[in-house]
Amino acid sequence: GVLDILKNAAKNILAHAAEQI
């Protein structure tokens, strides 16, 4: 569902941010 997509997007953003640190 839409919430799942948003959750996955949030995970991807957080994961990418973690790599930046």
Swiss-Prot record:
Q: Which residues form the signal peptide?
A: none
| Keywords from the named record | Amidation, Amphibian defense peptide, Antibiotic, Antimicrobial, Cytolysis, Hemolysis, Secreted
Annotated positions of the Isoleucine amide modification: 21
Q: Indicate yes or no for the key word Secreted.
A: yes
Subcellular location(s) per record: Secreted
Pfam families cross-referenced by the UniProt entry? Antimicrobial15
Please provide one cellular component term from the Gene Ontology annotations of this protein. extracellular region
Tell me where it mainly resides. secreted
The yes or no answer to whether the keyword Metal-binding is present is no
What the record says about family reads:
Belongs to the frog skin active peptide (FSAP) family. Ocellatin subfamily.
Task: Write out the function statement from the record.
Answer: Has hemolytic activity against human erythrocytes and antibacterial activity against the Gram-negative bacterium E.coli.
Q: State the protein's name.
A: Ocellatin-3
Specify the species: Leptodactylus ocellatus (Argus frog)
